Regions:
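Gly/Gly-Pro-rich "capping" loops immediately C-terminal to redox-active cysteine motifs
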Residues: 73-111
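Secretory-pathway/luminal and periplasmic proteins that interact with or process carbohydrate-rich
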Residues: 64-66, 80-86, 144-148
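The canonical Cys-X-X-Cys-His
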Residues: 69-79, 135, 139
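Post-cleavage N-terminal segment of exported redox proteins
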Residues: 2-55, 99-149
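Sequence context of c-type cytochrome heme-c attachment sites
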Residues: 52-64
């Protein structure tokens, strides 16, 4: 009986730590969003972040030099709470949603690096602060993976 209580206590502690880690990364994402909103408002004082604009940005197809159309959703699926797969390499990609993946937004320098890399790769230039703010706001709303078929 004592052994069972110890196992339950350990499992509850692990679940609590996991929940705190996920919440910390959601908090990191929110902090980064505030930074981008502030920058965007220096460019356009009337800027207001938008989940709708973030979703449109995430799903926007851009014609690549090879003629193929790509979007963030091409690798990350249309639901950022789902795991994705790299369109070229087939490599598995963990979900983007920080509510689902407690490693997303853990390292904000890496987030900045990935924004620069992917924006230049797909759009051909760095994303604006407004685009980044909207993108993260959208990711924060996606908390439920799609049901498996």
């Amino acid at each position: 009986m004592k052994h069972t209580h110890l196992i339950l206590a350990t499992l509850l502690s692990f679940a609590t730590l996991t929940a705190h880690a996920a919440q910390a990364n959601v908090t990191n994402a929110e902090a980064l969003t505030k930074k981008y909103i502030s920058i965007a408002q220096t460019v356009n004082p009337e800027f207001v972040s938008s989940v709708t604009d973030g979703k449109m940005f995430f799903n926007r197809k851009i014609k690549m030099p090879n003629g193929k159309e790509m979007a963030c959703a091409s690798c990350h699926t249309t639901n950022p709470a789902n795991p994705g797969k790299h369109a070229l390499t087939g490599k598995a990609i963990d979900p983007l949603s920080p509510a689902v993946n407690n490693k997303r937004f853990k390292d904000l320098d890496k987030v900045e690096e990935k924004f620069t890399e992917h924006c230049n790769e797909i759009i051909g230039a760095d994303c604006t602060a407004a685009e980044k703010a909207n993108y993260i706001i959208y990711l924060l709303t996606e908390r439920t993976p799609s049901a498996k078929k």
